[in-house]
Amino acid sequence: KVLVIERGMAPGAKNMMGGRIYTHSLEKLVPDFRDRAPLERKVTKERISIGAGNEMTTIEYSYQDVKENEESYVVLRAKFDKWLAEEAEKKGALLVSNVQVTELITEGEGKKRRVVGVRCHDDEVYAKLVIIAEGANTVLLEEAGLTDPTDPKTMAVGVKEVYKFKKEDLENRLMLSGDEGLAWLTLGDMTDGLL
């Protein structure tokens, strides 16, 4: 049996990751996901913009012939995560939402120490395998002594904003055509003072 414990009210509600999904692992779990998943666009262009003061330089790489298991797609995580949770439930997983894991239950010492379950306030759940998906904020792992605290200097601040455009407007603004998708990374001094 598989139990998925979701801290948010629904899958994806607490997700802070951007909206790009790489297919190499997903394809192993759901081979026909391209036909059924809520995918927005296949990424066919990569842009990196570097800014300083009032100047910006952008590098673009375009590709069309990507091997099927090496591609990526733009997704809206709330839709995608809901779909993926439903897929897990179809395969027999039990999803519980709005439940926070407050502690990892471990046994053993030193290198033989392992996670054997989780505590959710007063409730405990034990398992042969526990997959921890707490992202960059490794609070549970740190509290259990299974990883060192994250050095703030190794972290980055990400900003995500979702806009809704008509298809034609989106393609004009981002210089795309058809079903082309774009991944765009910006960096530079425009973030000075935000930390």
Where are these regions (language model features)?
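N-terminal Rossmann-like FAD-binding beta1-loop-alpha1 element of flavoenzymes
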Residues: 1-4
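Helix-loop-beta segment of a Rossmann-like dinucleotide-binding subdomain
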Residues: 56-77, 117
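Flexible loop/turn segments at secondary-structure boundaries
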Residues: 11-13, 56-57, 139-140
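Short, flexible active-site loop motifs that bind/organize anionic cofactors or intermediates
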Residues: 16, 70, 91-94
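Generic structural signal for well-ordered, non-membrane alpha-helical segments
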Residues: 15, 19-23, 41, 73, ...
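Predominantly flavin-linked oxidoreductase catalytic cores and closely associated redox partners
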Residues: 7, 78, 83, 87-195
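N-terminal FAD cofactor-binding segment of flavoenzymes
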Residues: 7-53
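Short acidic/polar mixed-charge low-complexity motifs
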Residues: 53-56, 123-124
